[in-house]
Structures are given as structure tokens and as C-alpha cells.
Amino acid sequence: MRFPGKRKSKHYFPVADRGLVSFAEDAEAKDVYIVGIGQLLVDIEAHVDASWLERLGVAAGQSEVLDDDWVDKVYAELKAEDLVVGEYAGGSVGNTLHNFSVLADNRSFLLGAITRHITVNDYAFHYIRHTSARVGLNHLAPRDGPMGRAVCLVTADGERSFGISRGVMDDLPASAIPEELVAGGAALVLTAYLLRDETAPIFAATVRAMEIANAAGVPVVLSLGTASLVHHRRDSLRALIADKVDVLAGNLDEVAALTGETDPLLAASAALELVDLVLLTRDRHGLYLGGWVDESEARETRDPIHSKAIPEYNLYEYSRAMPRSACTQPQKVFSHINPYHGGAKVVANTNGAGDGALAALLHDMAANVHHRQSAPTSPKHRSRFLTYSSVHQICKYANRVSFEVLRRHAPRLVQGLPEREDSLEEDYWDA
């Protein structure tokens, strides 16, 4: 596993010359990977004016499932007017796993349904071609029918709205979930989109995977999808999250829809009553990370202390997140960071920024598992932690990855972060 080296604030991970622990003295590390269940989609990106949202029947910033024939008709019109700017491998979980594998140079596995018949230059061919070779696709379930598609309408303000053509994306049966693979992962990554339709095969498959992960002690990570989806299924989602989910990720609108709190800190705090760790993104206002830590493991920040809706909310942001169940005296910890370098100069669209941030968090969680297996006697593992780094450092890392996604105007990274940041003076690297 690649451990990112020096960055804007020295280390995301310690990489050399710490001299604390000899890996050779401990047990040999097992393979570390993450598993995700995704709706395999091809994103069809089109730059349009707001009138197209009404024509497609999609609310601004939301995602709606539409009739396949209607999507075919709209797609033909977009092509005829030369509004389609690209067609890419997509899907929230697919993007997250791809970016995780690129960042960590490590394996991940994608579970889902894909069309049985794949030919050169069709949608399924391009999906596979644009997915990192480190993402294992050998557990995909082949099904008769077309590939799922997401028409991504990007308006002048950079907002993206999706019209979804299902194809076979929901046809993953519970019997296709590989129990041993899920139970051996460092995390199980899911999205609330999988839970939209309780009659769909993928719903039962997702619940089955959750049960396997819960029984094996594998953290279940859920991204919330869209605010409209959360509003529609709020009560059932809250019950499922409280029962089976460990880590929650979403933007402010989505977390607010789940918790009823519109302030980001209060929304994150309310979400922590359901889960152990919360990643909350807020567009141009950066991102927040909230978690639990035992009072004995709380570490005070050495940065300025800030107060917002929660007084001195970042006082213990140098703490590493722990499962609440592992805390004798649990307390909440929060950190916030503004966009890296003020954000990308030009934001063509925000597609994938949240998936990138979540990939960074997953990298840190997997690194914790990797280190614990490699050096179980290290003092870093005297308590049961969810993360390798502090919530403060993870905020910085997630923020940097989001910036890279926005800067490249694509939801999937083509390479990891640079070994040296161009913004830093040369003597920094010699320090």
C-alpha cells in the first residue's frame, strides 16, 4: 500500500525515519483491500441550460430514475444538438473504489451487475477500460440487458443533475455476494442509491453484504446519494444506518435531510448519534469530519481553536477516530477545513468531489488496518481506532483529493497525488 508522503502540512502518514517500530518483529501482514457494491453506470455528461432539466424531468442537483426509452430520446436530442461533452465510467461507488485504488496503489473489489454481452466500444467496454486495473471486476454478475446510464446535465453554475436509465444496474442477486471476500475486507462501501427500491435484487444483496460485514467486524461505509432520496426514505434509512452502518458520508443537504439539522456542525453531531464517523462536504465551504474518541485518547489541537454552532469544536481535532463501542468515556471530535488553495480556479462541475474525499478517508482507514496487521504491538494500536491519522489530518487529505478531482474536471483520478507539491518551496523537501 502506498502511504502518501510529505504534503502541505508535512505528513498525512509517517513514511520514514520514525524509528518506533520494526515491522519485521511482528506478524506478516495479510492482503488489505476494500469491497464496494455499486450500480454500474456510464455517465453521459452534457452542458445545458436550465430548461433541459424541466424537459428531462429532473430537479436541479438531484437524481431521478427515468424510463429507459425516454432517456434514449433525450440522449439522441443532446447528441443532435452537440451538447454531449463526454461519456465516462461512473457510479458513486465505482468512482470511490477507482480513486481509492489510484491513491493507495492497492486493490479493491467492485460488486454489481453488468451486461452479459460486451463488444468493443460499447458502454460496458468503456466502463471497464476507464476503471483502474487495481479494481477487481471478477466478481461482477453478468446479466441480460443494457448497461445502466446516467445522463449528467451540467448547468452554467456547475451544478449537476442526473437522469438515470436503469438497464441491468439493479439486477445483482444476493446469491452473488462473495461472503469470504466481504468478511476479509478493510471496509464495505455502499451508497443509499442501492436502497432506493426494496423490490430490486440489489437491495437484498446490499442488506446481505451489510450483515456479513457486521458479523465480521468490517466497517460499513455509506454515502447518502441525494437529498431527495434521503427525504423520501428518511425513516427507513435512519433505522438501517443506526443498525448496520459505521461511517456516513454526504453533503450538507443530504446529512441535513437525514438529521433535520441545517448547520453543518450540528448535522454532523446529530449523525454521530447514528454512526461512528461522519464525513460532511459543503461545496465552496470545504468539508467537516466528526467522530468519537475515548477521553483517554483525546488529543488537543496545536492549531487555533474555533467556535461556531459548537463552541471550541476543534479542540480535540488531533485525535484519531474510534468506534463509539470501544470508548469507555466517549466524546465527539470535529475538524473543518476550507477548500485547498481556495478551491479550483474553474469548476466545470462538482461531479465526483465527494467520492474523492471519501476515497481519501477509506485510504486512511485501510492504512490503519495495514499497519495494525503489520505491527500489532505498535503503540498506535493500544486502543481500537478506526483511522490511522487524526481527524484533522484526514480533513486535509480528503480536501486535497477533492481539489484534484475538481481541477481535472473528471470524477476519476488518472494518477495519485504528486510526490511534491508545486506550491511548496524547494527547501521544504530538504528539511
Describe every region a protein language model picked out.
Residues 87-111, 355-359:
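Active-site alpha-helical elements of protease catalytic centers
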Residues 1-63, 84-88, 105, 113-344, ...:
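Ribokinase/PfkB-type carbohydrate-kinase core domain
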Residues 353, 357, 394, 398:
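The catalytic Tyr-X3-Lys active-site helix of short-chain dehydrogenase/reductase
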Residues 56-80:
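Active-site gating loops and adjacent loop-to-helix segments of metal-dependent hydrolytic enzymes
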Residues 348-351:
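Short, threonine-centered small-residue motifs that mark membrane-proximal processing/anchoring sites
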